[in-house]
C-alpha cells in the first residue's frame, strides 16, 4: 500500500500530518503518520471493523454475527479462528487453524457451567447430562443413576 502522502506530493496538493480519512459514520478508514507509517480499514454498517491493512502489507479481516459478535478472523499469515455464540452473546465455541477447539455452556445467569477442549479437558456438567431422576447418565464413560437434582 502506497502512503497517501506520496500521491498528494506527486499531485502538488498541500497536506499536514497526521493524514486522517473517516467514512460517513465517523470510522477511521485511513491514517498516516509523519514517518510514513499508514493503515487503512473497512467497516460494516454497524461500525465493526471488517478489514485492516498497514503500509507493510500486513492485513486481517473480521466477520460478525447479527449481534455484533466476532465470528471469524483471518490474517495475511494464514492464521484464522472462528467463534460461535448463544442468544445471550456468550461464546459457545472456538476453533483455530491448529485444530484447537473449545466448547462452553452457560446457565441462565450467564455463568459458565461446562468447558471442554480439544486436549480432552472437561470441566463442569454438560447440559446433556442433566436429565430426570432415575435416568442413567453417562459422563466421560462412567454411568450414573440420577437422584433428584
Report the location of each language-model feature:
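A detector of tandem-repeat and repeat-rich interaction/domain scaffolds
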Residues: 16-129
Amino acid at each position: 500500500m502506497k502512503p497517501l502522502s506520496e500521491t498528494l506530493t506527486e499531485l502538488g496538493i498541500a497536506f499536514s500530518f497526521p493524514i486522517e480519512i473517516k467514512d460517513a459514520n465517523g470510522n477511521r478508514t485511513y491514517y498516516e503518520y509523519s514517518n510514513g507509517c499508514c493503515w487503512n480499514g473497512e467497516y460494516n454498517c454497524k461500525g465493526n471493523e471488517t478489514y485492516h491493512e498497514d503500509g507493510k502489507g500486513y492485513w486481517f479481516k473480521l466477520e460478525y454475527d447479527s449481534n455484533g459478535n466476532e465470528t471469524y478472523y483471518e490474517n495475511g499469515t494464514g492464521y484464522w479462528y472462528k467463534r460461535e455464540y448463544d442468544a445471550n452473546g456468550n461464546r459457545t465455541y472456538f476453533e483455530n487453524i491448529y485444530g484447537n477447539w473449545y466448547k462452553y455452556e452457560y446457565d441462565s445467569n450467564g455463568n459458565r457451567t461446562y468447558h471442554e477442549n480439544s486436549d480432552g479437558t472437561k470441566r463442569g456438567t454438560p447440559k446433556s447430562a442433566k436429565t430426570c431422576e432415575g435416568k442413567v447418565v453417562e459422563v466421560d464413560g462412567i454411568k450414573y443413576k440420577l437422584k433428584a437434582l
